[in-house]
Amino acid sequence: MTDACCLKGNEDKMVPRFGHGTWIGKAFNDTPEMLHERSLRQEKRLERANELMNDDSLQKLETAAMARSRSVDSAPLGNYTIWKNEYRRGKSFEDMLRLMQDQIIMARVYSGLAKFTNNLALHQEIETQLMKLAWEEESTDIDQEQRVLDSIRDMGQILARAHEQLYECKLVTNKLRAMLQTVEDELENEQTYITFLTQLASKALPDAIHCLTMRLNLEYHLLPLPMRNFPRRENLENPKLYHYALFSDNVLAASVVVNSTVMNAQDPSRHVFHLVTDKLNFGAMSMWFLLNPPGEATIHVQRFEDFTWLNSSYSPVLSQLESAAMKKFYFKTARSESVESGSENLKYRYPKYMSMLNHLRFYIPRIFPKLEKILFVDDDVVVQKDLTPLWSIDLKGKVNENFDPKFCGWAYGMNIFDLKEWKKNNITETYHFWQNLNENRTLWKLGTLPPGLITFYNLTQPLQRKWHLLGLGYDKGIDVKKIERSAVIHYNGHMKPWTEMGISKYQPYWTKYTNFDHPYIFTCRLFE
């Protein structure tokens, strides 16, 4: 083949001229205008090819890429040359499939180049073989292996001809770069969509827990009033005992927190759990712990709607949660025009953000006025060791002690609060001050961590890291040894252990404190 040249001869004869494997000479039925247009198109193609070859920026990128590739060991990829004798002897069926996938990539490159150079016959041949390869890849027939090998041979022959006719380094490189960009864009869109679905699913209550809650609610309302009282009420205000504050509307998660704490306590009789929920879950939460009391420990269940002092005139956040503007901001994310715009704001559309339960942590001294110290725990933690030493830690005049040694940033999950220092520093009033400033959500959108970081600024004392380990709800790479030596592990993140999205290797640390033989849990088919 002669590239972009003219063969001299008799002017009366048809003189073929080839460019990238495509004949652009005069045909018998060509008019002078058609021949001129064809010649112009070919000149434009050659001009574009020269531009690509002279593009310094592309040359620099390719040079850098080749330099990086020298340090990459390509031996694990093997040799996919099908015409070598050792290929059939040493390669597995999986290797043939990998070769097929490589061929598909190159076939798409040459198919595009064939169409670009107007070589429609080769373009159609490649597309036909691509369809055949795709069908073989999805096939599960018994004789699939032999047919795959035959298809690979056929495609290899077509690619060899395509390489001979169409190959030009710059054009192939740019085609591969364009394909890579397309794949990266598709991958980014898929990741956005996955993030959207993950956030959406993480905010929904699993059917099994909803079933459990409904059954417990029914049983509670059928229970006679005298049988609804918890024992050992005299321990609720005893400052010499170890008190826990747990605010939750998830009965199963709350049960794991209580069970894990009691089972790892040296003296369970000295531990008191103050559980606050809402009126919708009060019956279920009460019934569960009436049926499954935490051994010798004390437990008390309340609903925050019974706190008469907690009203919109006292609490700025309660007034804001009830406002039309807040509800509009919260619910408008459901009407996003696209997945991309919806996923950006979906994190704010979390039911707990519209629940006062999420903000009760700022009113702990008002809820428990006679206590001096209390350990606040979230419902997505598991306790693995005895926590009684936390009450003997000197907070050095600070309001709370948390796990992170950097006072400028910390997290909820487990915090020991000195309620006397809390009152002395007017923490609740400080919280109200910042909530009023954020009425229009200019400082932060929703949630309790931002106001918590501001309110407790410079009023925290660090704990040793062994007490609290974060990340089991999103980080799949946590060292098992770190998990096992931590006193409290925290499933913060979207992948909660009671959902199907939970990270499987971390779920046993949570499920070991769940009684799957309980008739209600068994009937509701949790984790089936």
From Swiss-Prot:
Disulfide bonds: none annotated. GO terms for biological process: cell wall organization; pectin biosynthetic process. Coiled coil: none annotated. Keywords: Cell wall biogenesis/degradation, Glycosyltransferase, Transferase. Belongs to the glycosyltransferase 8 family. Expression not detected in roots, inflorescences, siliques, leaves or stems. The signal-anchor present in all the other members of the family is missing. PANTHER family: GALACTURONOSYLTRANSFERASE 2-RELATED (PTHR32116:SF58), GALACTURONOSYLTRANSFERASE 4-RELATED (PTHR32116). This is Putative galacturonosyltransferase 2.
